[in-house]
Amino acid sequence: LEVIDLKQKILAVLLSFCCMISVTACGQSGPAFDAGTYTKGCLDAFLKKTFSEEYLKYSNSTEDEAKQAYEDSLDADVEALISESDNVSTALKKKYRDMFVQIYKNMKYEIGNVKDNKDGTYSVTVKTHRLIVFKNTIGPVEDYYASLSSKKQKKYTEEKLQMMIVDNVIDNMKTLEYDETPLDVTITVAPVENKKDQYAIDSEDYQRLYAAMMDGSEWAGDDSDDSAESTDSTEATAPPAAN
């Protein structure tokens, strides 16, 4: 395996993080709907596995259904990561899943100002503290691999290298580190087209929000500090509306 091939695979995985979580939600029109509570409920449900009464009401689901949606989301995350790989072991799938759980549950965010735009939409400011996830994860593995003789390199499968990198990511979560300067991301909560009393957050807004919640340039092999802008070209899965 060439190190550049490993970099390309990891970069592809990194860019897929922004489209992993799909949120199902609906709301009630009028004074009963709180866009800030709705936004926090969605994030808590799919990142923290925490389900408030308000979220269950807005998503029109039971707690068991919400828990299943969380588990299904993690399964989808793993499938997205391995979609172009053959014969991925159960052990690596489990490590990927554990990695997602650790990253998501340690994301830090607060709901700030909520503005009623008087056109049926709401602007919600989310203050995020970027989680340092990928620092010193791929570099050490690359250096170690490059230091091996060609004969020894042949003994390393791509999966084994992936396992080493994921282990580094999970180890990073043992000592949490966040950027000192918080980032404010304003998203729009809007009615779902042709769905009365249902609301959703635009997929591009989710993409910007997730990009602000964690680093990425280090893991992709880019030493710059422009990771907040590095996801502009990624695509996010549109969150479906609930029935």
Cite the ranges covered by each PLM segment:
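Repetitive helical segments and hydrophobic/amphipathic motifs
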Residues: 17-18
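Positively charged n-region of N-terminal signal peptides that target proteins for export
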Residues: 2-10, 14
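C-terminal motif of bacterial Sec signal peptides marking the signal peptidase cleavage site
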Residues: 22-25
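Mature, Sec-exported extracytoplasmic domains of Gram-positive
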Residues: 29-243
